[in-house]
Design a protein with these regions (language model features):
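Long, contiguous N-terminal structural blocks used for assembly/anchoring
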Residues: 5-108
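Acidic, proline/glycine-rich low-complexity IDRs
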Residues: 7-24, 117-173
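Compact soluble domain cores
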Residues: 86-136
Length: 173
C-alpha cells in the first residue's frame, strides 16, 4: 500500500515524513513549524522537488526577511510594479481599520507616526507552500505574510522561484 512508500523530508529543522503523490497540508501544531506548511501533490512524488522544499523550508525565515526587504523597496520606489499593491496593503492596515485595531496590530507604536516601512517589520510568516506555477510550468515557493491572523485575514503573498528570487508580490484576503 501507499504507506510503504513513506518518505522523509530532507531538511534540518524538523523530522517530517510524507507519502509521495499525496498533498502535504500541515498546521503548526501538527508539524512543529511556526507556520502553515503545504506542498501540492504533484510535487510530493518528485524527489528533486522535495529536496528543494526541504532546503527552502530550512531557510524560510531568511526568505521572509528577503520578502520584507522587497516590500520595503517597493514602498520606496514609485516606479516599482509592486508599489501600488504594497502601498495599498499598508494604507489599509494603518488608515482604514480603525484606531483600536491599529493599536492591536502594531503594539508599542504611535499610529499617527507609524511609517509604512516600520509596519513591514510587524509582518510575520504565516505560511510556506510549494506548488507548480502553471504559467511558468515550474516549481515555485509561496510565503504568506500577515500582521496578525486573529485580527486581519489580509495577506501579503510573495512568490519565489527555485533560485530564491522573488517574481511576484500580491495582496490576498
Amino acid at each position: 500500500g501507499k504507506e510503504d512508500n513513506i518518505m522523509k523530508l530532507n531538511c534540518k529543522r524538523i523530522d517530517f515524513t510524507y507519502i509521495p503523490g499525496e498533498e502535504i497540508f500541515n498546521f503548526p501544531e501538527e508539524s512543529g513549524l511556526p507556520f502553515l506548511f503545504d506542498v501540492e501533490e504533484e510535487l510530493t512524488g518528485d524527489p528533486a522537488a522535495m529536496d528543494a522544499v526541504g532546503e527552502m523550508l530550512d531557510e524560510a525565515e531568511k526568505l521572509a526577511e528577503k520578502a520584507k526587504a522587497a516590500i520595503k523597496a517597493a514602498l520606496a520606489d514609485e516606479d516599482s510594479r509592486y508599489h501600488s499593491v504594497v502601498t495599498f496593503f499598508m494604507e489599509f492596515h494603518r488608515d482604514d481599520v480603525g484606531p483600536d485595531i491599529v493599536a492591536e496590530l502594531f503594539p508599542g507604536t504611535d499610529p499617527a507616526k507609524l511609517s509604512f516601512a516600520e509596519m513591514v517589520d510587524f509582518l510575520k510568516l504565516k505560511r510556506f507552500g510549494s506548488l507548480v506555477d502553471s504559467e511558468m510550468n515550474q516549481q515555485v515557493f509561496i510565503l504568506d505574510l500577515s500582521f496578525n491572523p486573529e485580527i486581519t485575514d489580509e495577506l501579503m503573498v510573495i512568490y519565489f522561484d527555485l533560485n530564491k528570487e522573488i517574481f511576484c508580490i500580491t495582496h490576498e484576503s
